[in-house]
């Protein structure tokens, strides 16, 4: 009996990974990321003295298959500078420029086997870009425009770096897998009344959790 109990205790740490293989594959994902957005606006770098805007974003997704995901996300960006009013053409002095993109997307993932270390992906979909410009004289211009985005990148598994931490994430938070992500995203969003493109190109890095 003592021998049987000892064997049970020794085999217990293997129970969680073994049990996971019999569970349904994870369907939901949470993505948090940040990076640099380079607007397509003319004379952006000259007017704002910077090559881009810092962006922070998050997204939820649902996998119908491990290779096909539907999701939605949102982000925020802000930059300060001294520019002409992009929508009226008059000198504006100091200005704060804000963008808030909202995305609905489909993602195709290159998953061939369970536990794959590197997963390439491409995606795209609809984008609504909310904008706001706050000028020195107190005037505010705001609105939104619709367009589209495309993106591609890599999801790099972090599970193998610390298996004990991965097991704790599964037991405590029901997180099956954690990935480090790097991606490039291109947006084209035309404001109809002015024909200004509120889109541009973004470079992101962050974390993806599957549960």
Residue positions per predicted region:
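Short glycine/proline- and aromatic-enriched beta-strand/turn motifs that initiate or cap beta-hairpins
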Residues: 18-63, 190-194, 200, 206-210
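Short loop/turn motifs that connect adjacent beta-strands in outer-membrane beta-barrel proteins
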Residues: 19-28, 62-67, 111-119, 159-178
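Residues that define the transmembrane beta-barrel architecture of outer-membrane proteins
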Residues: 26, 50-56, 96-102, 118, ...
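Transmembrane beta-strands of outer-membrane beta-barrel proteins
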Residues: 28-32, 66-72, 100-104, 118-124, ...
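Residues on the lipid-exposed face of transmembrane beta-strands in outer-membrane beta-barrel proteins
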Residues: 32-34, 58-62, 72, 104-110, ...
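Transmembrane beta-strands of outer-membrane beta-barrel pores
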Residues: 34-40, 74-80, 110, 126-132, ...
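Gram-negative (and chloroplast) outer-membrane scaffold detector with strong preference
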Residues: 59-136
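Predominantly the C-terminal beta-signal and adjacent terminal strand-loop region
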Residues: 155-211
């Amino acid at each position: 009996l003592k021998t049987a109990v000892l064997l049970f205790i020794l085999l217990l740490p293997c129970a969680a990974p073994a049990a996971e293989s019999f569970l349904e594959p994870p369907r939901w994902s949470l993505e948090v990321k940040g990076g640099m957005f380079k607007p397509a606006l003319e004379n952006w770098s000259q007017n704002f003295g910077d090559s881009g805007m810092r962006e922070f974003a998050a997204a939820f997704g649902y996998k119908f298959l491990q290779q096909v995901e539907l999701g939605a996300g949102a982000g925020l960006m802000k930059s300060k500078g001294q520019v002409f009013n992009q929508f009226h053409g008059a000198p504006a002095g100091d200005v704060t420029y804000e963008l808030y993109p909202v995305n609905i997307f489909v993602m195709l993932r290159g998953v061939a086997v369970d536990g794959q270390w590197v997963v390439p992906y491409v995606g795209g979909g609809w984008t609504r870009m909310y904008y706001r410009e706050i000028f020195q004289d107190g005037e505010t211009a705001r609105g939104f425009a619709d367009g589209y985005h495309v993106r591609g990148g890599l999801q790099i598994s972090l599970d193998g770096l610390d298996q004990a931490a991965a097991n704790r994430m599964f037991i405590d938070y029901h997180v099956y897998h954690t990935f480090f992500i790097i991606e490039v995203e291109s947006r084209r969003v035309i404001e109809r009344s002015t024909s200004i493109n509120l889109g541009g190109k973004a470079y992101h890095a962050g974390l993806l959790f599957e549960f």
